[in-house]
Amino acid sequence: MEGGGGSSNKSTGGLAGFFGAGGAGYSNADLAGVPLTGMNPLSPYLNVDPRYLVQDTDEFILPTGANKTRGRFELAFFTIGGCCMTGAAFGALNGLRLGLKETQSMPWSKPRNVQILNMVTRQGALWANTLGSLALLYSAFGVIIEKTRGAEDDFNTVAAGTMTGMLYKCTGGLRGIARGGLAGLTLTSVYALYNNWEHMKGSLLQQSL
């Protein structure tokens, strides 16, 4: 009986070795500290430490040549639409404020309501057109710079913002171009600094240690 059991164990071990499952395994003590996150099963037949298989973030299968993040062209539609809606909302509120201020001496009547409504629509369209035009120029410059350089980084953001300000204020002469470029440079630099603030803090902490 013992011989039969021994031969059975040998045959099982031989089959396990043939299929690659007879390598170095992990004991219960090794697997006790592995966190059970998600639906990841733990198997003693793995040839790697299961602790390295825990995924902190979602992983997606991307087509060949695809980027992990959206480029300037994909973000252009969201940027332009968001700026138009933001401008329309801000302009409507500003128009309501101006309409109430200009008609405060008038009693509540249909002419006053029409005047307030006209002010709301006029200011909403004005601000939506302004911010939408800026977003369109910024997105166009961003796409051109990205395609020209073949890279997507904060330099594209700052350069696109500076060129947008210069072109938007080009009708004001050299002084207007300088002011527009400086305004675009300042705003985009602050935006880039805000996006990289956590990374900069981590780098400074590592250098201090």
Curated annotation (Swiss-Prot):
The chain crosses the membrane at residues 73-93, 125-145, 181-197. One of its GO terms (molecular function) is protein transmembrane transporter activity. Coiled coil: none annotated. It is found in: Mitochondrion inner membrane. InterPro entries: Tim23, Tim23-like. It is a multi-pass membrane protein. The keyword Ribonucleoprotein does not apply. GO terms for cellular component: migrasome; mitochondrial inner membrane; mitochondrial intermembrane space; mitochondrion; TIM23 mitochondrial import inner membrane translocase complex. One of its GO terms (biological process) is type 2 mitophagy. It comes from the Eukaryota. Belongs to the Tim17/Tim22/Tim23 family. Component of the TIM23 complex at least composed of TIMM23, TIMM17 (TIMM17A or TIMM17B) and TIMM50; within this complex, directly interacts with TIMM50. The complex interacts with the TIMM44 component of the PAM complex and with DNAJC15. Upon mitochondrial depolarization, interacts with PINK1; the interaction is required for PINK1 accumulation at the outer mitochondrial membrane, kinase activation by autophosphorylation and PRKN recruitement to mitochondria. Essential component of the TIM23 complex, a complex that mediates the translocation of transit peptide-containing proteins across the mitochondrial inner membrane. Has a role in the activation of stress-induced mitophagy by protecting PINK1 from OMA1-mediated degradation and facilitating its accumulation at the outer mitochondrial membrane in response to depolarization. This is Mitochondrial import inner membrane translocase subunit Tim23. It comes from Rattus norvegicus.
